[in-house]
Amino acid sequence: MRLNDSPQVEHVIAQDIDANRSLDWDNVILACGPCNRTKSNRQCPPTTHYLPEYHNTHLAFDYFVSSQKNHGEPAAYIRPHQQYIDIVKANNTIDLCALDRDTTRTFDQATDLRWKYRFETMVRALILRDELEEWPYINLHGFIKFLKMIVEATGFWSIWYETFIDVLEIRRMLVMDFAGTDQHSFDSTTFLPIPRTPRHAGDSI
């Protein structure tokens, strides 16, 4: 999977808060540079934030899939009508890494290019979605193999999943063929997202 920024080691509990935990395996995660810089030394335990190591974050967050450069549209927002989402925890997560940051107004000077990369991927995803719709007799198996190569080259798994969410065979490919995708976060038959921690009432994702 393509990485647009050099991965950095991020500490859930910052080193200047508890240096003794700086090498603890359960205290480190991979993060992109802009996310890491934005987080700084703020703590983000799974009790107050949604983390992909513990939660099915695809259920908590969404962003507009659009080919139009409208201000803010590619930014993350909390999925509506999800009664099991902890709104405070979701907002904490968005704020932690500035997932809703809109860099369109300062594009020429921006150093945080997450918006640019997301937008470019959205355009590609929508083009390929149109291709699938316009070719009713397309070889779906061949299309899926081609699509997998594109997803591997561009990244942004969630954009591709959301764009093709109504195509079962593509959902299956995205869930089953990408290493690191948590199998417990998706139904084993429909490959639709499901709560990852259903035992936790009020915060099951």
PLM region descriptions:
Residues 11, 49, 55-58, 71, ...:
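Histidine (H) residue identity feature
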Residues 73-103:
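Charged, amphipathic alpha-helical linkers/stalks
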Residues 44-45, 51, 73, 135, ...:
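Intrinsic-disorder/low-complexity coil detector
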Residues 91-205:
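C-terminal, charged low-complexity interaction regions
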Residues 1-30, 42-59:
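Histidine-centered nuclease catalytic patch
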Residues 36-37:
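Detector for the c-type heme attachment site
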Residues 21-33, 58-82:
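Short Fe-S-cluster ligation motifs
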